């Protein structure tokens, strides 16, 4: 299957859903880019279905199903896609094409859906490891699927791809702490809140911004070794893919830096990168993609969170 309309749908989804990744996605070769965009479209669709949104915006009509029912629908359609059924929704038709073309294991897809299940059942996060497990399901396993699209099959490089997903999600959580709180979700370790004298009821209140900024700084700093680990994985990717991934890494890491630097004002406006900043980071990433091939990399640190094998 090579349906142009599926690619158009995926391009539109990326353009609206993730301006941070849209620039990086242009660096892939055409075949890889198609699959990357279509996998992203499926991930975004699943996220929106659970939240009863369209590309992050609230649905105009009240939900006709409960979150539990919507999750069951996603699971059913994912099983149908793997079974070879004709998929009529663009996001699932796109996913079916990608999964079949790149031999993406059903376990990865359902690991991703487990992240949405954690939201639906309002999972609790006591320690950082609990938060990292959530990060794995919503982003780390996406890194695994993306790496497979790029031809990666060895576990060492897959570990690094998962690490990048973990870093991205830690950055996401830091950036979106207040928005998530308004949506009734908290991914912060309860032990961290307790350390700052906060709880799930008051942590996002304006008067607690100073303490919240310290928690955000911890998240950003926790992401650093995962970004560093991901850098070591660039050598395992085709060069253009390495450039694209290095660009995404640089852009997203910069968002975390901005959250940390903004301190108490981090949530006055959504932290993002400007077009000139993206272009500067893109150029820096080209050098990183090249130099990653020219030096030996140390083994992955043993203290990092380990994905399920």
Curated annotation (Swiss-Prot):
Q: Which domain of life is it from?
A: Bacteria
Cofactor binding, per record: ATP is required for the transferase activity but it does not seem to be hydrolyzed during the reaction.
Which keywords belong to this entry?
Carotenoid biosynthesis, Magnesium, Manganese, Metal-binding, Transferase
Q: Which cofactor does it need?
A: ATP; Mn(2+); Mg(2+)
* Class in the EC hierarchy, top level: transferase
The record's Pfam families line, in alphabetical order, gives: SQS_PSY
Asked whether the keyword Magnesium is assigned, the reply is yes
Q: How is its activity regulated?
A: Inhibited by phosphate ions and squalestatin.
Name the pathway.
Carotenoid biosynthesis; phytoene biosynthesis
Q: Which InterPro entries match?
A: Isoprenoid_synthase_dom_sf (IPR008949), Phytoene_synthase-rel (IPR053452), Squ/phyt_synthse (IPR002060), Squalene/phytoene_synthase_CS (IPR019845), Trans_IPPS_bact-type (IPR044843), Trans_IPPS_HH (IPR033904)
For whether the record's keyword set contains Magnesium, the answer is yes
Q: Which NCBIfam families match?
A: Phyto_syn_CrtB
Q: What is this protein called?
A: 15-cis-phytoene synthase
